[in-house]
Every structure is written in structure tokens, then in C-alpha cells.
Amino acid sequence: MAHSPIHGRITETEGDLFDAPDGAALIHACNCQGSWGKGIAQAFKNKYPAAFTIYRAHCQNLLSKASYRTVNPVPDEGSLTGNSRKVRLPEGTALVIPPQEHDHMGRHKKHWIICLFTSRGFGRGVSSPAVIIQNTELAVVDMRRQIAELHAEEGLGGFSGELWSCRFNSGLFGVDWALSRKVLEDAGLEVTVVSPREG
């Protein structure tokens, strides 16, 4: 039996991403070096310092003992990618961080943080747009797998199932938002994407 493609529903709005409902997961793109030093990543670091500590330790662990995998994408008409390549973890993966008590105690909502490792580096070391989109495709598949595992567990650990996101990859990584949005749509995800209010 043939399956028809599933397209997600992306709702775009203006406001503050950090006003997402309690229990929601906030998605953003990350480098693999353990740095949330600029842009929206710095805002995540300021709001969720305990989550940042987990992200940084995850990166440092993989930087200290290298682990690689070969990715063989299946090119399609609209794909920017198509060549197999060797990637060093955590590139092309997702890190799902549960709410940390220090981050929400007495002042913040309980948010899950989802890091999509879409660029190996940052600044001058940022990956090319084609590599970032390929890594986004891989990381979104990994994120979906981890979310499915959460849903299979009793109680979901406070995860509401709601996915919220910034226009990831489009800031300091310099990738056209429409390309990242298409990855989310093609993955069949429902995501609320929040951009800062103009003015």
C-alpha cells in the first residue's frame, strides 16, 4: 500500500518564543562546539542556564572522543544535497533536554529545549547552507524519534507535545528560512514558529 506524503502544519506568529505554553518544547539550531554565544542562542543561554550546561557537556564529551557516521541522503527534485559524507557527532542529531528545575524555579515556565545540531561550527566556521539543510533533515528525524520515545513512556515527563520554534538557521547561520520550514513541513510536524515583533 503506497503512502502519500504527510505535510506538517507550520503556524507563524510574532511575539516572544519564551512565552510558549508550560510543557512546550522550544526548538533551535545549534553549533557542535558547545557555544550559545550570540543571537537567539544567547537568549536561550540567559533564560535556561542549566539546559545550556547540559548542551555544553554533551558537545564537550563528543569533542573529546570523536565519533563519526556516514550519511547517505536520497536526493529529490528540491533537495540541495545528495552526496554521502562523513559527519562527526553530534552534527545532524538532536538533543532533547527536559525542563531543569534551576531554569524554571519560581520564575519561568517549564520548557523542554530541543537542540538541532545543524552546523559544525559558528562564526567563520559555520557550515555551508547545503550542509546545514542536510543536517537539519537528519536532526529533525532524530528529534521525531526521541519525541516518539517520550510519547511511549508513561506520563511524558511533563512534555505537552507542543513544538515551538524560532526561525532557526536563518539568523547567524544565514540560511533562507523557507528551506528550514520545508524540512519541518516534509517531516509532518506541527510547529508554532515565533518571530520577534517588528518595531
Curated annotation (Swiss-Prot):
Q: The organism sits in which domain of life?
A: Eukaryota
Going by the UniProt record, its keywords in alphabetical order are: Hydrolase, Protein phosphatase
User: What GO MF annotations does this protein's record show?
Assistant: phosphoprotein phosphatase activity
Cite the SUPFAM superfamilies for this sequence: Macro domain-like (SSF52949)
Query: Where does the record place the Macro domain?
Result: 1-199
According to UniProt, the reaction catalysed is: ADP-alpha-D-ribose 1''-phosphate + H2O = ADP-D-ribose + phosphate
The EC designation for this entry is 3.1.3.84
The chain's coiled-coil residues are none
Positions binding substrate in this chain are: 15-17, 29-31, 36-41, 168-174
Mind listing the GO biological process terms from this record? Answer: peptidyl-glutamate ADP-deribosylation
The question of whether Ribonucleoprotein is a record keyword is answered with: no
Q: What does this protein do?
A: Highly specific phosphatase involved in the metabolism of ADP-ribose 1''-phosphate (Appr1p) which is produced as a consequence of tRNA splicing.
Q: What family name appears in the similarity comment? A: Belongs to the POA1 family.
Name of the protein: ADP-ribose 1''-phosphate phosphatase
